[in-house]
């Protein structure tokens, strides 16, 4: 029974949390649709011999796309329709992100979101997703259990005399797993110990011990990534490993175990 620790309580999300979760997932679906449209525009240009040398999806690139000299009217109309869909999706996502910021400022979420935003790679959308999708972080006894819940723990193929390590299990909450992998991709850039103005602004207003814990995590994760790369690990393998450790640090932050090392 529960009183003797024989069973663990099952977390049941509130209707409020579930509604926020659905809104966030809807936003993610539109983000995927935007990615698909970008791929379609790129493919169209390649098929018809239009190559852009600079960084794509900047203002300069968008201006280039709109001013392409295309003599075939139907080709031009096709690209214009693609560009219209692109701009429509961009406007939607901008509107959704504004609404997500408003939700994150609600009393029940604000403090937790501010804490999670102290980590490199975690901004409002990711922070709020972690909170409402996970619910009660304390149902996980350790950080590595939380990483397993997200499918970020390494698998293994064991026999009586050997253990063969595998990649991450990918068994668990795929939405949060993808968000943390994307966040880790942001961590794995830049100098170890560097704090941008944007990160300092996000950390502003938090307690000193919260910022110190996040700084420790940021430094460790970035250092670990570069160590993996120096030792010949593939980038995607290294990023997945960093995502696992980031999940452990997130668990520590949300359960007030901020003196603990990542599991």
For each of these PLM feature ranges, what is it?
Residues 5-9, 37-38, 93, 135-139, ...:
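Short helix-capping/linker segments at secondary-structure and domain boundaries
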Residues 223-263:
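Basic, amphipathic alpha-helical segments enriched in Lys/Arg and hydrophobic/aromatic residues
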Residues 1-43, 193:
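Extended, highly charged alpha-helical segments
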Residues 1-14, 21-22, 61-68, 162-171, ...:
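Short alpha-helix plus adjacent loop in nuclease-associated cores
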Residues 24-115, 203-207:
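Glycine-rich, often acidic, oxyanion-interacting loops/wings at catalytic, nucleic-acid
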Residues 30, 89, 180, 232, ...:
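A residue-level signal for conserved active-site and pocket-lining positions in enzyme catalytic cores
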Residues 56-66, 138, 188, 215, ...:
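HhH-family (HhH-GPD) DNA N-glycosylase catalytic core used in base-excision repair
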Residues 114-118, 124, 129-231:
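Phosphate-backbone recognition surface of nucleic-acid-processing proteins
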């Amino acid at each position: 029974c529960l009183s003797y620790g024989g069973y663990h309580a099952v977390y049941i999300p509130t209707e409020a949390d579930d509604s926020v979760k659905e809104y966030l997932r809807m936003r993610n679906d539109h983000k995927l649709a935007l990615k698909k449209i970008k791929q379609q525009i790129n493919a169209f240009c390649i098929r018809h011999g239009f190559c852009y040398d600079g960084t794509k999806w900047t203002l300069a690139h968008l201006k280039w796309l709109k001013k392409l000299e295309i003599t075939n009217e139907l080709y031009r109309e096709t690209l214009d329709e693609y560009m219209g869909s692109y701009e429509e999706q961009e406007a939607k996502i901008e509107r959704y992100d504004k609404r997500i910021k408003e939700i994150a400022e609600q009393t029940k979420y604000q403090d937790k979101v501010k804490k999670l935003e102290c980590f490199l790679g975690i901004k409002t959308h990711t922070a709020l997703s972690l909170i409402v999708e996970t619910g009660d972080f304390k149902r996980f006894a350790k950080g590595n259990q939380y990483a397993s819940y997200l499918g970020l723990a390494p698998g293994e193929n064991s026999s009586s005399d050997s253990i063969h390590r595998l990649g991450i299990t990918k068994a668990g909450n795929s939405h949060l797993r993808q968000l943390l992998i994307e966040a880790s991709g942001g961590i794995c850039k830049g100098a170890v110990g560097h704090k941008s103005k944007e990160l300092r602004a996000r950390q502003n207003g938090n307690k000193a011990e919260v910022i110190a814990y996040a700084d420790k995590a940021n430094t460790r994760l970035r250092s670990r990534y570069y160590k993996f790369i120096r030792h010949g690990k593939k980038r995607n393998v290294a990023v997945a490993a960093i995502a696992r450790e980031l999940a452990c640090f997130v668990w520590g932050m949300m359960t007030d175990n901020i003196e603990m090392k990542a599991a």
